[in-house]
């Protein structure tokens, strides 16, 4: 059995950035778990295209308008505003300053802003055509500099430890739900262990692999959504899955993605 203050399930950009923010308190013990043998292995690592920043002719209001328009009336206005206002500054603070990600620049040393579908401004930052790999490498290196962050590999989260979900007393079903960590499957030892935590963060990525055709890697199978549902979380809009529209359809090239940047710069079928 393991124990920590904060347990983060998933080591992609969401889990890694959460850990870096929380680790500012040196007394806080944080454990990140990943089912992969290598902490670099995540959906983030496979992203070829870029990430949204804030260009010189851009604003939070313009980005918010683009997000809501692309969402066709379904996106949460509150969540969209948080993303539009807080996302680009955090990109600079965490990815550039803390993780040292070297986004592409032009001959003058200024950021090279790219354009992608549904964006009214050039606001996409790239690292060549391997942006995700560069972000993953930078974040992993940053995590390793914190002595209060531990990364556990080859550990698959099976279920959340919740009260009263796992209680033997039937009357506990009337009590409020609380999460106390996760059951983890040790892929090397072939055994399930309890990992207790005061706070549990689900950062498990997507679910593309539940579909026959996808550009997602094998790990994107919806584990986090399933665990959250079993624990009593409300799952909404799960039917809205965005499929990457450009991929290489060739024998032996299953799920080989063609970057959205190709279309953003004017390519067409």
Language-model segments: residues:
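Helix-loop-beta segment of a Rossmann-like dinucleotide-binding subdomain
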Residues: 73-77, 110-137, 208-212
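Rossmann-like flavin
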Residues: 70-119
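Residues forming the flavin
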Residues: 1-65, 128-269
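N-terminal/domain-start segments enriched in small and hydrophobic, helix-friendly residues
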Residues: 2-8, 27, 87, 104, ...
């Amino acid at each position: 059995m393991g124990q920590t203050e904060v347990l983060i399930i998933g080591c992609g950009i969401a889990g890694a950035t959460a850990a870096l923010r929380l680790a500012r308190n040196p007394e806080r013990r944080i454990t990140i778990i990943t089912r992969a043998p290598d902490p670099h292995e995540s959906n983030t690592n496979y992203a070829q295209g870029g990430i949204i920043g804030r260009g010189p002719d851009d604003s939070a209001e313009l980005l918010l308008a683009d997000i809501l328009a692309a969402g066709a009336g379904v996106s949460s206005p509150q969540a969209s505003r948080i993303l539009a206002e807080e996302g680009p500054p955090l990109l600079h603070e965490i990815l550039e300053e803390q993780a040292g990600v070297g986004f592409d620049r032009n001959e003058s040393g200024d950021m090279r802003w790219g354009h992608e579908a549904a964006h009214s401004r050039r606001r996409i930052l790239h690292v060549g055509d391997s942006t995700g790999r560069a972000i993953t490498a930078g974040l992993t290196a940053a995590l390793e500099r914190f002595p209060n962050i531990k990364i556990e590999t080859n550990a698959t989260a099976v279920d959340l430890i919740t009260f009263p979900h796992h209680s033997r007393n039937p009357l506990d079903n009337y009590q409020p739900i609380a999460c106390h960590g996760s059951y983890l499957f040790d892929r090397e030892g072939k055994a399930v262990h309890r990992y207790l935590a005061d706070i549990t963060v689900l950062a498990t990525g997507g679910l593309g692999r539940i579909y026959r055709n996808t550009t997602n890697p094998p790990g994107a199978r919806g584990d986090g959504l399933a665990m959250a549902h079993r624990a009593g979380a409300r799952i909404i809009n799960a039917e809205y899955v965005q499929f990457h529209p450009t991929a290489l359809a060739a024998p032996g090239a299953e799920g080989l993605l063609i970057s959205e940047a190709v279309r953003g710069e004017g390519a067409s079928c």
